[in-house]
Amino acid sequence: MKITKMLLVGLALISFDSFSQKVQKAAFQVVPLGVMGGIDEKNLSAYLVAPSNTNDYICLDAGTINAGIEKAIENKVFRVSASEVLRKYIKGYLISHAHLDHVSGLIINSPADSSKTVYATKRCMEMMENHYFNDQTWANFGDEGPGFHIKRYHFQTLNIGEETVITN
């Protein structure tokens, strides 16, 4: 009986505490541009993330960019052109690994993009510099690596276990 009373009092306190909490709004907004891998080139891994009520997005992976932005416009997520989202809303890219289903949108859209930072680990950055942005497979839109540097993108290497400030 004593345990039952204690449990009831505990549940009442937890319930009261739950009702007294203020409703918290989401701190971030997420816009999926692509959520798959494989053969569907219009739906490859790419997510825009921004603090709520801003247009300051970082793109987490970049498999699909333009097609995903067009889909987001169609779904009324954005009320501006795809070009404006690409050039002004996306402030940088954070690339998890250099498989094409995670970077093809970054590569293909680089001629139309504005200057921004690409963040990746050393191994990932080396793959992008040596195999994609190398002035042979594709123009080097970066500021490092082989060939002529167009310098559209600043390549910033991330150190595992260290915090990195995202610019812009």
Model regions and ranges:
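Zn-dependent metallo-beta-lactamase
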Residues: I3-Y57, T64-N66
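Pre-active-site segment of Zn-dependent metallo-hydrolases
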Residues: I39-A98, S104-P111
